[in-house]
């Protein structure tokens, strides 16, 4: 539904270098899953897209997108939707990038920019190609199919994924609006911390969430630096940089992977904090005043738009084919929604003026049937 709506609203055409091997029908609202073939890398990837409950219905509305590596461990997408829909963070599209069954070990190639030899095995070296896949192939693909804001994307990685995210920051801090770097395996790339330190002064307001588990301080099997060493080195490289909005967290009593759900819960709101509408004053209006807004409207493109009320007097906006959006009043004839940066104003004629991200659209009230 969202794909069709975006295309109907005139999303700009983009080249799509990725071949869709399969596009599974959604199993629930706000969920899409693709298997995409990358000619650049020569392999297929699974890409799962979760969209928040409050879906855009005005031309030009864009949402941030969080790109979660390792398929977000199956948690990032659903957790992100809950956080988006409850006002804990700015609503965002969650894009989880992973592998087909039996191919998860390709992460050892894709997530390491340099080769590493560990316990007699040599792997890695595919990070630059995977970085190009994300930035030049996957992001344009997602932005053509979903209302994702190209300037407000976030990269989220843990372990080797955290190492990859730190390497992307080191290459070009402005590649993403924000970075979530969890338990980065900096031991696998000894030059990483120095590169991050050199890149940090070039950042322009990047929001970074840096974490490690308290119990990750034990030495690596066979010796070498620890995850905690990597965390401390990255913290020193990023702390105090004027262009980096940094939050760092050591999760007490947690191991390498056990804190991952908390990493999502805490990290997403840092990189995408809830917007101003959440702090708007909610005025209380008489029931008779509320009732005058209820009715059927028509958008300029012909789509029906209705406003209804529930038993508690709350107002809801409905666009055909999409979930209802709750409306909270913040003054006479003015409403906002906490899950989208949007507002609705009723004028003297009873028509509505809906605004999203500075754009407006007028919806005329339908005449009552005789």
Regions of interest found by a model, annotated:
Residues 15-63:
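A domain-start/cap signature at the N-terminus of enzymes
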Residues 62-133, 137, 141, 145:
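Serine-hydrolase catalytic machinery in alpha/beta-hydrolase-like enzymes
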Residues 99-101, 180-188, 213-216:
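Active-site nucleophile loop of the alpha/beta-hydrolase fold
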Residues 147-158, 179:
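Alpha/beta-hydrolase fold nucleophile elbow
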Residues 157-161, 165:
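Gly/Ala-rich beta-loop-alpha elbow adjacent to hydrolase catalytic centers
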Residues 167-177:
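Conserved hydrolase catalytic core segment
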Residues 211, 217, 228-232, 239-282:
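C-terminal catalytic histidine-bearing segment of alpha/beta-hydrolase fold enzymes
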Residues 275-370:
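Peripheral terminal and inter-domain segments
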């Amino acid at each position: 539904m969202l794909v069709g709506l975006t295309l109907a609203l005139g999303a700009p055409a983009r080249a799509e270098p990725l071949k869709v091997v399969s596009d599974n029908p959604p199993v629930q609202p706000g969920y899409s899953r693709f298997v995409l073939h990358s000619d650049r890398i020569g392999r297929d990837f699974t890409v799962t897209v979760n969209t928040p409950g409050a879906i855009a219905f005005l031309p030009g509305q864009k949402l941030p997108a969080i790109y979660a590596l390792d398929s977000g461990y199956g948690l990032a997408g659903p957790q992100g939707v809950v956080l988006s829909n409850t006002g804990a963070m700015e609503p965002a599209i969650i894009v989880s990038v992973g592998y087909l069954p039996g191919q998860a070990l390709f992460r050892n190639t894709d997530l390491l920019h340099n080769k590493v030899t560990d316990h007699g095995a040599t792997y890695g070296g595919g990070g630059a190609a995977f970085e190009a896949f994300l930035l030049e192939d996957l992001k344009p693909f997602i932005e053509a199919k979903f209302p994702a804001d190209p300037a407000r994307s976030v990269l989220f990685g843990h372990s080797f994924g955290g190492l990859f995210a730190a390497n992307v920051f080191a290459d070009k801090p402005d590649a993403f609006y924000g970075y979530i770097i969890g338990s980065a395996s900096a031991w696998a790339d000894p030059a990483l911390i120095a590169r991050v330190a050199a890149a940090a002064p070039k950042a322009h307001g990047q929001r970074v969430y840096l974490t490690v588990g308290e119990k990750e301080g034990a030495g690596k099997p066979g010796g070498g630096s620890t995850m905690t060493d990597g965390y401390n080195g990255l913290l020193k490289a990023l702390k105090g940089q004027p262009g980096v909005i940094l939050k760092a967290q050591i999760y007490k009593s947690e191991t390498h992977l056990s804190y991952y759900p908390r990493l999502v819960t805490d990290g997403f709101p840092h990189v995408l904090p809830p917007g101003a509408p959440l702090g708007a004053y909610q005025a209380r209006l008489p029931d008779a005043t509320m009732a005058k807004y209820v009715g059927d409207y028509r958008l300029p493109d012909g789509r029906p738009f209705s406003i209804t009320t529930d038993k508690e007097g709350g107002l809801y906006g409905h666009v055909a084919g999409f979930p209802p959006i709750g409306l909270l009043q913040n003054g006479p004839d003015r409403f906002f929604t906490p899950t989208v940066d949007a507002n609705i104003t009723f004028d003297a004629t009873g028509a509505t003026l809906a605004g999203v991200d500075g754009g407006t659209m007028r919806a005329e009230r339908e005449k009552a049937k005789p």
